[in-house]
């Protein structure tokens, strides 16, 4: 039986050894017969051909208890708290017993400590820098139809931020075990070496856990 490794929220990082999913509207347009080819040159991003459209919140088109490994990097922070918990529930469902889940999100503790340090040093725009760093603020309300469409379909803003303790607790509540901080390429399963990018671990919460 062939082992199955799934990455969701893959963006443009789609190693051939993994099954890669993304929920970008651009990808959905790109996958449309004829129209996708016509509009390809006008799209802001062109996804690799092996990226499939799939939404972890609605459920990925893979069987329950079927995945040996699961990976997501800088994806979960783009979800509301409710959707985040649904994503963890669905992640747990598709993993095999003993399967490994590795996830990475920006570390709000790091950003908060940076903010306090700047504030204590007298930086008068420390709060602005903090909100910019978290990607949670809105500098300007969307205007016109183009702005509305970009705001509605875009997914660049962060909706919920995490530190290690809070993310580990959520994983525990979702049923995961053997929860630990992880580092780049420190998994005992070598398949994760194909999908991980060292730069994504910088100033981030990185956790490995098992079903």
Where are each of the predicted segments found?
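S-adenosyl-L-methionine-dependent methyltransferase catalytic module, highlighting the catalytic core
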Residues: 82-92, 96, 100-210
């Amino acid at each position: 039986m062939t082992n199955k490794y799934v990455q969701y929220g893959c963006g443009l990082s789609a190693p051939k050894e993994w099954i890669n999913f993304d929920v970008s509207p651009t990808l959905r347009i790109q996958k449309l017969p004829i129209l996708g080819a016509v509009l390809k040159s006008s799209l802001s991003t062109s996804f690799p051909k092996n990226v499939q459209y799939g939404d972890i919140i609605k459920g990925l088109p893979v069987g329950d208890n079927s995945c040996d490994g699961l990976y997501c990097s800088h994806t979960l922070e783009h979800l509301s708290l409710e959707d985040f918990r649904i994503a963890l529930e669905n992640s747990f469902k598709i993993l095999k017993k003993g399967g490994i889940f590795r996830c990475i999100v920006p570390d709000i503790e790091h950003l908060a400590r940076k903010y306090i340090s700047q504030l204590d040093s007298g930086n008068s725009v420390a709060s602005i820098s903090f909100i910019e760093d978290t990607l949670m603020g809105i500098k300007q309300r969307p205007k016109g139809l183009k702005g509305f469409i970009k705001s509605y379909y875009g997914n660049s803003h962060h909706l919920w931020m995490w530190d290690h303790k809070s993310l580990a607790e959520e994983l525990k509540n979702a049923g995961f075990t053997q929860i630990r901080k992880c580092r780049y390429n420190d998994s005992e399963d070598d398949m994760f070496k194909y999908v991980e990018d060292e730069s994504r671990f910088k100033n981030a919460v990185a956790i490995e856990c098992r079903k």
